[in-house]
Amino acid sequence: MGVCGYLFLPWKCLVVVSLRLLFLVPTGVPVRSGDATFPKAMDNVTVRQGESATLRCTIDNRVTRVAWLNRSTILYAGNDKWCLDPRVVLLSNTQTQYSIEIQNVDVYDEGPYTCSVQTDNHPKTSRVHLIVQVSPKIVEISSDISINEGNNISLTCIATGRPEPTVTWRHISPKAVGFVSEDEYLEIQGITREQSGEYECSASNDVAAPVVRRVNVTVNYPPYISEAKGTGVPVGQKGTLQCEASAVPSAEFQWFKDDKRLVEGKKGVKVENRPFLSRLTFFNVSEHDYGNYTCVASNKLGHTNASIMLFGPGAVSEVNNGTSRRAGCIWLLPLLVLHLLLKF
């Protein structure tokens, strides 16, 4: 649809037959194009949506009548406007140039425009094609998603523009891994926790700056205890047991000793829970406090636990991830092996 396609006067916006009646193209005379040095319109005109397009036609003093047409619709004939569209204005009508301007160009203005002239001999025409470029726009994109580890996901990013924009997906957090897809659709099979974070969709077509939208992907997984730290503390001193767990959603922590849960508020003991960390603090350690404690981390997807020792000085030499060994066993074992070798 051209510039007059949506608003016209029935008695003015005429087809080419009407133009023949104006003697620009006399009935029965074939229209010639490109067989003379005039009229000479511009080459293809490319403008961005919303800008103004100027259509120029070079003529000379042999021209008696001149007009601009959009397909079969007359826009201007000489100084007379034949189209009601207020965006179409006459810029110049001289012996050497006949120019019009289309303001605030839109995509429906795209198409062929013809400069038609009448001389003493015969009519001539010259054609120019108006190309309208449109900045990229993302019209549809997936919402933020929460999914369990191991499942499949599909992200969608639909963009429009002229020329058709190129769509790319990029994983930008927590670790930038570069482009992951050059397509409107991003498929991830068996997603892992490392693939969580923000995914950026970019649409570009060199008409304007790329447009960017982001989707946040949350990958849920059961707790994993990454550190279970015991400690050796003399009687009467302050001691802390620490348990760290990675999980999404964040883990909830509980502490047990001899199958009994330790609760906040017990005299001399404090339980401090954070999203990925729990501390069990003894402000005045007694002999009764020594022993094995169990840290339990859980969320809706599962749970895990680790054993941690609170011990006196010299009682335990190594505590890590819920394992402990008596210090005496560490140095007695080499002596026992040496004794057996000497005996035999």
Swiss-Prot record:
<dbReference type="InterPro" id="IPR007110">
    <property type="entry name" value="Ig-like_dom"/>
</dbReference>
<feature type="disulfide bond">
    <location>
        <begin position="57"/>
        <end position="115"/>
    </location>
</feature>
<dbReference type="GO" id="GO:0098686">
    <property type="term" value="C:hippocampal mossy fiber to CA3 synapse"/>
</dbReference>
<comment type="similarity">
    <text>Belongs to the immunoglobulin superfamily. IgLON family.</text>
</comment>
<keyword id="KW-1003">Cell membrane</keyword>
<keyword id="KW-0393">Immunoglobulin domain</keyword>
<dbReference type="Pfam" id="PF00047">
    <property type="entry name" value="ig"/>
</dbReference>
<dbReference type="GO" id="GO:0021549">
    <property type="term" value="P:cerebellum development"/>
</dbReference>
<dbReference type="GO" id="GO:0060253">
    <property type="term" value="P:negative regulation of glial cell proliferation"/>
</dbReference>
<dbReference type="GO" id="GO:0005615">
    <property type="term" value="C:extracellular space"/>
</dbReference>
<dbReference type="GO" id="GO:0098839">
    <property type="term" value="C:postsynaptic density membrane"/>
</dbReference>
<keyword id="KW-0677">Repeat</keyword>
<dbReference type="GO" id="GO:0007155">
    <property type="term" value="P:cell adhesion"/>
</dbReference>
<keyword id="KW-1015">Disulfide bond</keyword>
<keyword id="KW-0336">GPI-anchor</keyword>
<comment type="function">
    <text>Neural cell adhesion molecule.</text>
</comment>
<dbReference type="GO" id="GO:0030424">
    <property type="term" value="C:axon"/>
</dbReference>
<feature type="disulfide bond">
    <location>
        <begin position="243"/>
        <end position="295"/>
    </location>
</feature>
<feature type="glycosylation site" description="N-linked (GlcNAc...) asparagine">
    <location>
        <position position="44"/>
    </location>
</feature>
<feature type="glycosylation site" description="N-linked (GlcNAc...) asparagine">
    <location>
        <position position="152"/>
    </location>
</feature>
<dbReference type="GO" id="GO:0010976">
    <property type="term" value="P:positive regulation of neuron projection development"/>
</dbReference>
<dbReference type="GO" id="GO:0060076">
    <property type="term" value="C:excitatory synapse"/>
</dbReference>
<feature type="glycosylation site" description="N-linked (GlcNAc...) asparagine">
    <location>
        <position position="70"/>
    </location>
</feature>
<feature type="lipid moiety-binding region" description="GPI-anchor amidated asparagine">
    <location>
        <position position="321"/>
    </location>
</feature>
<dbReference type="GO" id="GO:0042802">
    <property type="term" value="F:identical protein binding"/>
</dbReference>
<dbReference type="GO" id="GO:0048471">
    <property type="term" value="C:perinuclear region of cytoplasm"/>
</dbReference>
<feature type="disulfide bond">
    <location>
        <begin position="157"/>
        <end position="201"/>
    </location>
</feature>
<keyword id="KW-0449">Lipoprotein</keyword>
<dbReference type="GO" id="GO:0071392">
    <property type="term" value="P:cellular response to estradiol stimulus"/>
</dbReference>
<keyword id="KW-0325">Glycoprotein</keyword>
<dbReference type="InterPro" id="IPR050876">
    <property type="entry name" value="IgLON_domain"/>
</dbReference>
<dbReference type="InterPro" id="IPR013151">
    <property type="entry name" value="Immunoglobulin_dom"/>
</dbReference>
<dbReference type="GO" id="GO:1900149">
    <property type="term" value="P:positive regulation of Schwann cell migration"/>
</dbReference>
<feature type="domain" description="Ig-like C2-type 1">
    <location>
        <begin position="39"/>
        <end position="126"/>
    </location>
</feature>
<feature type="signal peptide">
    <location>
        <begin position="1"/>
        <end position="32"/>
    </location>
</feature>
<dbReference type="GO" id="GO:0098552">
    <property type="term" value="C:side of membrane"/>
</dbReference>
<feature type="glycosylation site" description="N-linked (GlcNAc...) asparagine">
    <location>
        <position position="321"/>
    </location>
</feature>
<dbReference type="GO" id="GO:0048787">
    <property type="term" value="C:presynaptic active zone membrane"/>
</dbReference>
<dbReference type="Pfam" id="PF07679">
    <property type="entry name" value="I-set"/>
</dbReference>
<dbReference type="InterPro" id="IPR013098">
    <property type="entry name" value="Ig_I-set"/>
</dbReference>
<keyword id="KW-0130">Cell adhesion</keyword>
<keyword id="KW-0732">Signal</keyword>
